[in-house]
Amino acid sequence: VALSASKNFTVTRDDIITMALRKIGANDAADVIPATELSAAALSLNTLVKEWTGEGLALWLRRTCVLFLQSGQQRYKVGSGTTAFCVNQDSIYYGTLTTALTTASTTLVVTTWYDYQDKVVSTNLGTGYAAIRLDSGVMDFCPITASSATGATFSGTPVDSAAAIGAKVYAFTTTSMITRPVRVLSATRLNNNGNTAEISLIGRADYDLLSQKNSSGNPTQMHFDPQLDAAQFLVWPVANSTDTNQIVMTLEFYPDDFDAAANNPEFPIEWANALVWNLAMEMSFEYGTDVRTRTQVAQIAISKKNILFDTADRENASVTFAVSQ
């Protein structure tokens, strides 16, 4: 048996488009699709994928992210151009200071860096930020130009005030900061000792009914407001101590856009055919496809999409049924 021993097959944006147009008889395999038609089809493909995201897609678009808390801050805006620091958890290094910091410090020194799995790491992060809990209780975010196995170099902006030996430090790259999420699936509070506590996700009406929204303590509730440009996390009560640094969340995101011909879909490859047939269904209206063909394409497209939504996009987890008392 002559097997390939490879499992890296994928498709590009233009592969999906050309296959979809063939399904409705709009082109042959040897045809060159005009750029204007490719552009129109790419627009339909992007809107189609975004619509699917609104329906609850998808397991592979979920990530564990960390929101760094500021003492006394109630509202955190995340997304492009925002000032809150919400970062992919697997991109964060942490350590503890072995040398105290002052406002004159240009570098920080830690015993060693660890990743989120508590494994020692020494990879240079490059440009990013160091998050340092100062003696004042404020979480200070300082730009860094580079990191080593035991420290990092500030990028012209030193800490705002002192930080003692033993203070916790987190480091991460600029590119690991998240874009606007679609929804929050779960949230937990994490303290410096590694202990966690669940945070209740509440709706807007319940949040509005909370009295004294600036009450301080350990956050127990959070409202997620997705907005259009920058999403907002509203926590209650607001963090007030050096004990709680983070809220760890499972977030769901949009898949990447199809911006260029060679872009691959941010989907498992088993979704390729569903993308092709559903794009064909969308494009059949624009190409004047006859009703019979359009109906057949629609039936196949809907079937392929529903099968994957019902089977491939589900977690492997046990379901327990119990008799009501």
Question: Predicted regions: what is each one?
Answer:
Residues V1-T102, T107, W113-Q325:
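Glycine-enriched, solvent-exposed interface loops adjoining structured elements
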